[in-house]
Curated annotation (Swiss-Prot):
The keyword Protein biosynthesis does not apply. The chain crosses the membrane at residues 2-22, 205-225, 226-246, 340-360, 657-677. It comes from Salmonella typhimurium (strain SL1344). The keyword Transmembrane applies. Pfam families: IgaA. The lineage of its organism: Bacteria, Pseudomonadati, Pseudomonadota, Gammaproteobacteria, Enterobacterales. Its main location: membrane. The gene is igaA. Residues 1, 361-656 are periplasmic. This is Intracellular growth attenuator protein IgaA. Changing residue 188 to H: Increased ability to proliferate within fibroblasts. It is found in: Cell inner membrane. Keywords: Cell inner membrane, Cell membrane, Growth regulation, Membrane, Transmembrane, Transmembrane helix, Virulence. Coiled coil: none annotated. It is a multi-pass membrane protein. GO terms for cellular component: plasma membrane.
């Protein structure tokens, strides 16, 4: 439900954003030439302003009817107000002026970037580098109604009847009419190569791509509910980065270049010329700004009529036959090594995060098996599995009867807290060999016999046979004493169990004291000779409890040792067969867990608990399914097969995504690392190569062959 709500909210937000963008574009579409000025503002035209504009247009129309010096009237400029003239556009921009050959006294044309505007000629003296301009739209050209605080209202009030004439410029950026005329040959858009010089180096796009890599990584460790949104965001970031790097520029992004013809001349430092330029060269009234590396070559065209392409900001894009920014980029492409470095570093960062935070073994194996087209195997017998030919990546569905594996201490790899210890039921030995018999132990039998003998004499039951009469036993019990009515049997069973000298030392000393013997060997000889038959020993309750504890502690090591030895004796399966293991440690049997782990039992109960466990797990039903992650055969001929649980659909996609992301990061790091190194080397020599190219074009060297010298 939360996913649906998030989706609906995101869809609603996108719809509102799209509606807002559409309304903004439609509002700007009503004035199509406004799109050239992104920072323009608009307001309504006031009635008094409209009246001043109409008066100015009437005066302009009358002036255009006056014949010029040659007797011809100026070509009429149709400036007629329309419905869109009620909107005033306010902007701050530079004004570019071009001269034309005409009899019209107002022979200048004015441009705001690529938009030609009509500027009242009496305002030419107020033109600055940056101008506060207010425009309205007419049927032909936008009309300037205010320039740097000067309005048509002021003009009509203060200079009514003033003749429209060209006012000589007093600003240093505009030279007088005596300046040489330049010819405007063409207005074109800059080429893609010329645009590349002003285009950013792509650092922002590289950061977007790295951010998309990081989002792809976090998709692997976030909950499934957020994964689609994060993948969508990562794809959008990646697409935005790639689009910014490789998409061709839009037509609106390409600046206009004016193709001029004139005679460039060097002028002294004056007025508004750029003081940072080494060479101060002008074309007519236009102060040219050259690329710094062109300085050695531009003097060849001085004083000669030359074709020059310039931007509206007076930067030169081409001059003469050879100097050309377009040819530079075409023959010596720009080397953006920094963006390749950023992408390579970002790829390495994500790769290290994958190596240290995400287990890669299973994703790689699953992806490779999926690409190879692994098979699905179902088997209920050992022979069926042998015929199938198991390979890594296969999917297995197995069921049958087998034995839970027992590990030796040196090779223990199962769960340390396995409920079936010492059996590991996450590994099943499956073969056709007969089941092993239940383990037996003489030492355990002897220890149990000793414990039972002492327990029977210390805690007699009425139905037990006794060498002492019932009345005497009752009298002894009433007195608070404890009677051992067969002391010799205890000595013999102790000697049978503890044959070594260093075994049961404390128990032997206690029995020697009770038997009033010189040492243990003498006591055993007396017992073997039958001299202890019929000997009764009276014990205080404290002494009886101490004797019972001594027997318990003396027999415990024997039983524990024999239990461990018996478990290891089962760790010898028949040759051949299979060992099916879950690499996640999952139990492969459906057995009830023991209420108490084996080694939590008292030593005297461990043996019987182990036998019950062995009887259950030495031939138990099992079922195993999963994907094969490893297959090998040991020296005993047993084939070891490791299984990993079959992932769900989400798990499959995560494994596949992990592998693909790792491969993509490796390829990206290697490719962009190499590209960064190569581009950096070329970037260092690019300017020298360009200058060498210009030297060869402008100052060619003639090579004379030896044959011509003869």
């Amino acid at each position: 439900m939360s996913t649906i709500l998030i989706f609906i909210a995101a869809l609603l937000a996108c719809s509102l954003l799209a509606i807002w963008r559409f309304r903004v574009k439609s509002r700007r579409g009503s004035l199509p030439w406004i799109s050239a000025f992104q920072d323009a503002q608009t307001r309504k035209l006031l009635p008094e302003e409209r009246s001043a504009v109409e008066n100015y247009l009437d005066n302009l129309s009358q002036i255009q009817q006056v014949p010029g010096p040659t007797g011809a009237s100026a070509a009429p400029i149709s400036l007629t107000l329309n419905a869109e003239s009620n909107s005033v556009v306010i902007l701050t921009h530079s004004i570019t002026r071009y001269g034309i050959t005409t009899d019209d006294p107002n022979k200048w044309r004015y441009y705001l970037d690529s938009v030609e505007v009509h500027l009242p000629p009496f305002w030419e003296q107020y033109i600055n580098d940056e101008n506060n301009v207010e425009l309205i739209l007419t049927d032909t050209l936008p009309l300037v109604i205010s320039l740097n605080g000067h309005t048509l209202q002021e003009y009509m009030q203060e200079s009514r009847g003033y003749a429209l004439q060209n006012t000589a410029s007093t600003q240093a950026s505009i030279r007088g009419e005596e300046s040489e005329q330049i010819e405007l040959l063409n207005i074109r858009q800059e080429t893609h190569e010329e645009y590349a010089l002003s285009r950013p180096a792509g650092l922002r796009e590289a950061l977007l791509i790295v951010a998309s890599f990081l989002l792809f990584f976090f998709c692997l460790i976030t909950p499934d509910v957020f994964v689609p949104w994060m993948i969508g965001g990562a794809i959008l970031l990646l697409a935005a980065g790639l689009w910014g790097l490789f998409a061709p520029p839009s037509k609106s992004a390409l600046r206009e270049i004016h193709c001029l013809r004139g005679t460039p001349r060097r002028w002294g430092l004056f007025g508004e010329n750029n003081q940072e330029q080494i060479n101060n060269i002008s074309l007519g009234i236009i102060d040219l700004i050259y690329p710094a590396h062109w300085q050695p070559y531009i003097t060849q065209d001085l004083g000669q009529q030359t074709d020059i392409d310039i931007y509206l900001d007076r930067h030169v894009a081409r001059q003469g036959r050879f100097l050309s920014l377009h040819d530079e980029v075409k023959n010596f492409p720009l080397q953006h090594w920094l963006r390749s470095t950023v992408i390579a570093i970002g790829s390495l960062l994500v790769l290290f995060m994958l190596l240290f935070w995400i287990p890669l073994d299973m994703p790689i194996k699953f992806t490779l098996s999926w690409m190879k087209g692994a098979q699905t195997i179902e088997a209920t017998t050992v022979k069926q599995l042998e015929k199938a030919g198991v390979r890594v990546g296969d999917t297995l569905h197995l069921s049958g009867k087998g034995m839970c594996n027992i590990h030796s201490g040196a090779t223990w790899s199962g769960q340390s807290n396995s409920p079936f210890m010492p059996f590991d039921c996450s590994q099943i030995i499956w073969n056709d060999a007969p089941a092993l018999p239940l383990p037996e132990s003489d030492l355990v039998n002897k220890a149990m016999a000793l414990s039972q003998a002492v327990n029977r004499q210390l805690h007699p039951k009425p139905e037990d046979d006794s060498r002492v009469s019932a009345s005497l036993r009752s009298a002894i019990q009433k007195s608070g004493m404890v009677l051992l009515d067969d002391f010799g049997d205890i000595v013999l069973k102790t000697a049978d169990l503890c044959a070594a000298e260093d075994e049961c030392v404390r128990l032997k000393n206690a029995l020697v004291n009770l038997g009033n013997s010189k040492d243990w060997n003498a006591l055993v000889k007396r017992a073997n000779a039958g001299k202890l038959d019929g000997v009764n020993v009276l014990l205080r309750p404290v002494s009886a409890e101490s004797l019972e504890n001594l027997v318990t502690t003396s027999t415990a090591p024997f039983i524990s040792r024999e239990t461990a030895r018996a478990a290891q004796s089962l760790n010898s399966p028949a040759p051949g067969g299979f060992l099916i293991a879950s690499d996640e440690g999952s139990e492969l049997v459906d057995q009830t867990w023991p209420s108490t782990p084996l080694y939590d039992y008292p030593a005297q109960e461990q043996w019987s608990a182990f036998q019950r466990l062995a009887q259950t797990l030495m031939q138990t039903p099992f079922s195993a399914e999963g994907i094969v992650t490893s297959v090998y055969t040991d020296a005993n001929g047993t084939q070891h097969i490791s299984l990993h649980r079959i992932p769900d659909k989400s798990g499959w996609w995560r494994y596949l995504g992990t592998t693909l992301l790792m491969l993509a990061m490796i390829v990206s790091a290697v490719y962009n690392g190499i590209q960064a190194f190569r581009r950096y080397q070329r970037h260092r020599t690019r300017m020298a190569d360009i200058q060498e190219y210009y030297e060869s074009c402008l100052n060619p060297r003639l090579t004379v062959s030896p044959e011509n010298l003869i």
